[in-house]
Swiss-Prot record:
Record GO terms (molecular function): metal ion binding; serine-type endopeptidase activity
Disulfide bonds: C16-C145, C34-C50, C118-C218, C125-C191, C156-C170, C181-C205
Protein name: Trypsin-2
Residue ranges of the propeptide: 5-9
Binding note for cofactor: Binds 1 Ca(2+) ion per subunit.
Family statement drawn from the similarity comment of this UniProt entry: Belongs to the peptidase S1 family.
Species of the source: Salmo salar
Subcellular location: Secreted, Extracellular space
Residues annotated as binding Ca(2+): E61, N63, V66, E71
Amino acid sequence: AAFATEDDKIVGGYECKAYSQPHQVSLNSGYHFCGGSLVNENWVVSAAHCYQSRVEVRLGEHNIQVTEGSEQFISSSRVIRHPNYSSYNIDNDIMLIKLSKPATLNTYVQPVALPTSCAPAGTMCTVSGWGNTMSSTADKNKLQCLNIPILSYSDCNNSYPGMITNAMFCAGYLEGGKDSCQGDSGGPVVCNGELQGVVSWGYGCAEPGNPGVYAKVCIFNDWLTSTMATY
C-alpha cells in the first residue's frame, strides 16, 4: 500500500455542514496542499511534513474552488516546525504558522481550543479535510468530515509495530473503509471541542488493519504555547 504522508483524503465520510468546522484552514501555494487548524487569531497548527517556507492560509472555506464570500486569505509571516520533527519516522509531526495579520473572527472563522488533557481511547472525534475521497460521488472541493474513535496504544502498535511513538496516536476503524487520506494532512482531529490530533500518516487509505496516524497535540501544549508567546 502507498505510504501516504505527503497529503492525506477522507474516505467513507460525509460533506461537512458548511462552516461547521470554522477552525479548518487550507494551506495554499497556488493549489490546496494541506490542511491546518486556527488556534487563535494569529496562529495555525499543521503538520511539519507540510512545511513550506511561505504559504497562503485560506480561512472560512467550504468549497475551495468557489468564491463564497466567507473567505479570508492571509499569507504566513513565519512557519516553525517542531525542533524534534523527524522526516525519517514522521515523529513530532507538528508545526506552527504565524499569520502576517490577525484573522478576523466571525461565524466562518473561529479558533479551536488546544487540549486541556490527552483524550482517552474510545473518544469520538471529527477529522476533516479536502483530500481525495476515493468516491465518484463525493465532491472533494467541499470540506469532508468523518467521525472516528481514538484507538488504544496496543491496537495502534499492532497495526504499525515499532513505528508508533508517544507523539502519535491512531484513530479510525481497524476493519477499514473509513479513514483520512491524501490532501487532508495537517488538518484537525477535534474531540469534544479540543484539537487532539493533526493528520499525519498511514499506510494506504482506509485499508483494513491500517488506521490513520495522528500527531498527538496534547503532548505539545508547552511547545505550542511557549512558541506562540515568543514570536
